[in-house]
Amino acid sequence: MFLFFFCDLFWLRLLLCMYYCVSRLCFIVYFNCLMLIFDFLLFCLFDLYLFVGLCLFLLLWFMLFNLYSLILYYCITYLNLYLLFCIVFLLYIAFLFLFCFLCDFFLFNNLLVGDSFMDVFFIRFLLCFLECFSLLCRCLSTFLRLFCNLLSSHFLLLMFFDFFYFIFVFFFYGVFCYFILFIFVFCFCLLFYVFLYLLDLFAAILQLFIFCNMILQLIMDFLLFLLFV
């Protein structure tokens, strides 16, 4: 009985390792294909749609892994709970980024206002960044608590590998989010101040034209006065 149990456990572990390898490979292939497709088709909206597509893909990928481990181990482990927490975290960040941060671009892109709007814009950017950072810290702290509670579990080995894997994923996820936010903020500020500079330049040229026209009108009036006198 022990021999059959050991063989059965060995094959289950082997199947799970194979599924891990295939899922990682599919994730890398999908991510690269998604980058190429959106790079050629979406242009300026590439970062936004890639972010949402990546969150949806992680959602489906984690759900498939949850179902697979549920069939193998007949229970919901700490890893499943943590993955569900990651799903909620990623979707909430996507919602926060799309509907709270980019709302300023969609609502106020046609308004010509002063520096007070820029203050509101940077305050919104700062609040959104702090909210994302606090949620990331909560996610990592929850993962550490789950990891400490898992020290005596039979799932320790896979959880240990997933610890480094999710740290790696969240690191690049944070770099990716920072890159998107920095590009949007930099482009918006650059276009805004270039537009203000062009507007000031046009106003200066218009004032110069009005001044020259007034001078020419005075000269013409003076010449007509000399002619008739």
From Swiss-Prot:
Main location: mitochondrion
Membrane topology: Multi-pass membrane protein
CC terms in the record's Gene Ontology section: mitochondrial inner membrane; proton-transporting ATP synthase complex
Localization (cell): Mitochondrion inner membrane
Keywords: ATP synthesis, CF(0), Hydrogen ion transport, Ion transport, Membrane, Mitochondrion, Mitochondrion inner membrane, Transmembrane, Transmembrane helix, Transport
Subunit details: F-type ATPases have 2 components, CF(1) - the catalytic core - and CF(0) - the membrane proton channel. CF(1) has five subunits: alpha(3), beta(3), gamma(1), delta(1), epsilon(1). CF(0) has three main subunits: a, b and c.
Name this polypeptide is given: ATP synthase subunit a
Native source species: Trypanosoma brucei brucei
Encoding gene, per UniProt annotation: ATP6
